[in-house]
């Protein structure tokens, strides 16, 4: 997990000592199954987050799908800033078991997890597509490619979705310079 930044995996306690986040239920299950991953801080809603290497993403996604995470709610990317890493994320839900659980208990909590893959922005960032596991990844992976330049190996339609095919660059990267754009100066 060399590309996963340490700033994402540690917090400080009252004394200032670095404390690793507690593994959540999904992380504990992955550990029992022998999958290497990094434990990340839960998000602001308490959703468990894990960091994985690009090479093992399909295996971990398949394992999670077999463990009930049957729905890809969202896939996307973001840029941590110029000179920093690009991040590709997958938000998985256990929908089938949720429907069954809600029949018995309407307040049942939905199982969800967010997988993050940290990529070097230099060269051509790429990772395996999970289109074969989750068909909903089709347009979402294409949009991430179109906006950030992250290529998804094995995707059946690897072309731009929103921008023209001849567009240069990746518009949502923070170091992107819009072609033929001139900033207007105030008249004052």
UniProtKB/Swiss-Prot annotation:
GO terms for molecular function: NADH dehydrogenase (ubiquinone) activity; quinone binding. Pfam families: Complex1_30kDa. GO terms for biological process: photosynthesis, light reaction. The keyword ATP-binding does not apply. The keyword Cell wall biogenesis/degradation does not apply. It is a peripheral membrane protein. It catalyses: a plastoquinone + NADH + (n+1) H(+)(in) = a plastoquinol + NAD(+) + n H(+)(out); a plastoquinone + NADPH + (n+1) H(+)(in) = a plastoquinol + NADP(+) + n H(+)(out). It is an enzyme of class 7 (translocase). Residues 1-23 are annotated as: Disordered. It is found in: Cellular thylakoid membrane. NCBIfam families: PRK12494.1. This is NAD(P)H-quinone oxidoreductase subunit J. It comes from Synechococcus sp. (strain CC9605). The lineage of its organism: Bacteria, Bacillati, Cyanobacteriota, Cyanophyceae, Synechococcales. The gene is ndhJ.
């Amino acid at each position: 997990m060399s590309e996963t930044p340490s700033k994402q995996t540690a917090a400080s306690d009252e004394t200032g000592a670095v404390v690793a986040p507690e593994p959540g239920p999904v992380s504990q299950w992955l550990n029992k199954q022998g999958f290497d991953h990094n434990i990340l801080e839960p998000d602001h809603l308490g959703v468990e987050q894990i960091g994985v290497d690009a090479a093992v993403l399909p295996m971990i996604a398949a394992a999670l799908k077999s463990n009930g995470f049957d729905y890809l709610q969202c896939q996307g990317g973001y840029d941590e800033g110029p000179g920093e890493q690009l991040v590709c994320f997958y938000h998985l839900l256990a929908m089938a078991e949720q429907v069954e659980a809600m029949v018995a208990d309407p307040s049942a909590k939905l199982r969800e997890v967010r997988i993050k893959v940290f990529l070097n922005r230099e060269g051509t960032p790429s990772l395996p597509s999970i289109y074969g596991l989750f068909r909903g990844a089709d347009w979402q992976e294409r949009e991430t490619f179109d906006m950030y330049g992250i290529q998804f190996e094995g995707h059946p339609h690897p072309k731009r979705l929103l921008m023209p095919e001849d567009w240069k660059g990746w518009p949502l990267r923070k170091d992107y310079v819009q072609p033929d754009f001139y900033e207007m100066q105030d008249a004052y």
